[in-house]
Amino acid sequence: MIQQVQQAVFDPERFLVDIEETCRAIGAPYSQEKTLKVLEGFQASFARGAVLWRITNRPGDALNYRFYERVSIDAVSCAVEAKLFQPNHPLSELIVSWTALYPGAAQQSCDFDAEQGFSKIWVYLGDMRPLSDILSAPHVPLSIRKHATTFYNLGLELVRHVAADFTSNTINIYFRVQGLLTLERARSLVRLSDPAYLLECGEVEEMRRLLNPVGFTFAVTMDYSTGDIKRVGIYALKLAPGTYPAMDERLKATRAIPLEKQAYILLSQGVLMAKEVAAAFPVPSETAAVNRPREVDVEVGVGVASFMFQPTTPIAPTVDVRDNVVVAVFHAVESP
């Protein structure tokens, strides 16, 4: 189902109201001071791009957001100029190295936290890239490179995204894994972060229900200083209608937001509201709108779910409402 919708211009004051109301609805921490610094530092990107929101079913977890624009930016320089981190930060040097691997193809963008402000820079590499390129880039520490054999033995050879989280001093590598997620394969992948944990058949069945049998995205989060694997994640992309994960009470809390605000739960600052929402989607509170002063294609029923595993928290699938997990993904196109 495709709709053409003319979108409103980004309004920072409206955004501040929306983010505070959403944090209040889900019980997420919020700092207006940090949020203002983000909006000031990336003013042009927020004006050009869609604003995507991310929440999880973990009580007290953060509300994250990002801008999504189809142009290449120097996110590192923007963050330094805005004094969001110091020049020559080790993680920023790593991001620059990864970006330089594929000139003209790699694209940088950022993730932000409603409480912490600036949190992460990630790089879309433009295509599937060999793991050897990623690990051999300048500024990749030996403690990270030492995992190469383990990754290859698990069939983790192709990388599409990388990221660096400045709040946790970690890096993420996002692999494309070919084929079906079997019980043994899932257990092998999860053991990277928690060797003692044994996935149950039912847990894998729930993930497999959402995963494309052709393949899936698998992420590894490592401490930049020590190389320790802190977390792994299995992502289900392009969810078909009717196959969405169950939403717990925290996620359903967004229903308390007035109807005209509900479109902001995933993407912000649009005019796909009220009757347009009701006409386009069966459940208005699980919809999204996009901030672009131009037309957009709305593809209903495309989304992302993720299952995170880390030894420091109870191991359980996590519903991750990110980049349209529930209903839609938006592709911006220029108006004629």
From Swiss-Prot:
Keywords: Prenyltransferase, Transferase. Its EC number is 2.5.1.-. The keyword Nucleotide-binding does not apply. Pfam families: PTase_Orf2. Optimum pH is 8.7. Signal peptide: none annotated. Transmembrane segments: none annotated. The keyword Hydrolase does not apply. GO terms for molecular function: prenyltransferase activity. Belongs to the aromatic prenyltransferase family. Prenyltransferase that attaches isoprenoid moieties to carbon atoms of aromatic substrates in an enzyme-catalyzed Friedel-Crafts reaction. Shows specificity for dimethylallyl diphosphate (DMAPP) and does not accept geranyl diphosphate (GPP) or isopentenyl diphosphate (IPP). Prenylates the artificial substrate 2,7-dihydroxynaphthalene (2,7-DHN), as well as dihydrophenazine-1-carboxylic acid at a lower level. The gene is not located within a recognizable secondary metabolic gene cluster. This is Aromatic prenyltransferase.
